Amino acid sequence: MTETAKLADVILPGRSYAEKEGTFSNTERRVQRVRKAVEIEGDTKPDTWIFTEIMRRMGYPQPHLTPAQIMDEIASVTPSFAGISHERLDSEEVNGQGLQWPCTSKDHPGTPIMHVGKFARGLGYFRPAAYTPSMELPDEEYPL
């Protein structure tokens, strides 16, 4: 158990990145498949299982969906992801390269460059965050 976990009131049985199945989006808006690389012994659970189990215990039951079903739901409610699915990400057409959103239909090639020449709404906005001091600092009881 890690030093942080020793201080926790609740420990969730999450998996490491190498144990996960699903998708991720990087900073260039590229959605790519993630495939489980290792099988770890123990009682770990997918993040989606943890979320739905917490909801169930709070009185809001939800079905346990597969990563592909979750991606399909995201595509059905988010127009810029409408053309992205596990099936398409796994296809020879995509060839392991992923798709860049917006990808608005099943035959859309994705959008490698989002803004050409200028931003759609004019200049970009820069808003530096104001410094906020920590509400709690490490102490003897919680040294991390």
Feature annotation, model-predicted:
Residues M1-S85:
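Non-catalytic alpha/beta scaffold blocks inside enzyme catalytic domains
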Residues P67-L144:
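Long, low-complexity segments enriched in small/aliphatic residues
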